[in-house]
């Protein structure tokens, strides 16, 4: 398969997932989003955003899903806010949520590899959250795009599941099921929804087990200098939550901030 074939397959999966979320999870958001104090941030995000400052900054979120996190960023004082996602239906959900919340954000349906060039060099912050990087077939090209989106001295903030978790099946505990160095994508023929595990997602999708060095190396290769990195014992994915209770456990998530130096 070619990279675009993977992207289109994953797009179909996300559109199916959006339909599932519209039946339950999104209805819960519809009321919450109207609250001026609505935020999705946990303590890690609060601390990092407080340190870097959001006031008036131009922010773009890649793989933004339905935009709820971007809406939070806007409500926290950011300036121009743009969200990119491959799913038509999640972008439509996001526009509806933003309208209900009275929030001015721009949500664009696009693969991250096909972002309009007129967005390059326009942002102070690229924001990437849980469940984004594993759906991308070419991480090096992705970080090249991240760099082009940023102004000089702009920052990228990544808050993601730790890639070591790709070695484990969440239902089998800490039994190693895959090599950390696997390059072939995992094929998900029938997955379950992360908000409602009773719902089966039938579309075939592809998850790429990138190494942590792929993330850090991608930043460094494209002129993004690390200013912060930390690993955590809490799960962001809702898949490995049971691992939090293990006495001996691997890292479950991490945060990374890097600055464009040229």
What role is predicted for each listed range?
Residues 1-29:
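N-terminal, positively charged/glycine-rich alpha-helical extensions of SAM-dependent methyltransferases
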Residues 155-193:
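Conserved class I S-adenosyl-L-methionine
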Residues 195, 206-230:
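Short alpha-helix
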Residues 140-155:
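A short glycine-rich, Lys/Arg-flanked "PGG" loop and its adjoining helix->strand segment in the class I
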Residues 58-115:
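Class I SAM-dependent methyltransferase SAM/SAH-binding core
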Residues 117-125:
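A short acidic, Gly/Pro-enriched loop at the edge of an enzyme's catalytic core
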Residues 27-57:
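Conserved alpha-helix/loop element of class I SAM-dependent methyltransferases that forms part
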Residues 124-140:
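A short SAM/SAH-binding and catalytic strip from SAM-dependent methyltransferases
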């Amino acid at each position: 398969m070619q990279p675009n074939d993977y992207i289109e397959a994953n797009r179909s999966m996300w559109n199916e997932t959006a339909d599932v979320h519209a039946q339950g999870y999104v209805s819960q958001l519809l009321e919450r989003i109207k609250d001026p104090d609505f935020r999705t941030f946990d303590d890690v995000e609060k601390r990092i955003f407080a340190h870097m400052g959001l006031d008036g900054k131009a922010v773009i979120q890649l793989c933004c899903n339905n935009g709820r996190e971007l809406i939070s960023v806007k409500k926290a004082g950011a300036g121009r806010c743009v969200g990119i996602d491959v799913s038509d239906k999640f972008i439509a959900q996001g526009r509806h949520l933003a309208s209900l919340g009275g929030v001015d954000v721009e949500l664009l349906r696009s693969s991250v590899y096909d972002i309009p060039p007129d967005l390059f060099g326009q942002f102070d912050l690229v924001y990437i959250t849980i469940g984004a990087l594993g759906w991308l077939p070419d991480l090096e090209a992705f970080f090249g795009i991240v760099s082009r989106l940023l102004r000089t001295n702009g920052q990228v903030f990544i808050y993601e599941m730790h890639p070591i978790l790709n070695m484990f099946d969440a239902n089998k505990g800490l039994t190693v099921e895959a090599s950390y160095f696997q390059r072939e994508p995992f094929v998900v023929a029938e997955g379950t929804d992360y908000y409602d595990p009773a719902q089966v997602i039938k579309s075939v999708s592809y998850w790429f087990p990138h190494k942590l060095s792929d993330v850090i190396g991608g930043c460094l290769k494209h002129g993004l200098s690390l200013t912060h990195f930390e690993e955590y014992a809490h799960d962001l994915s809702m898949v490995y939550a049971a691992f939090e209770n293990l006495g001996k456990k691997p890292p479950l998530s991490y945060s990374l901030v890097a600055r464009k130096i040229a």
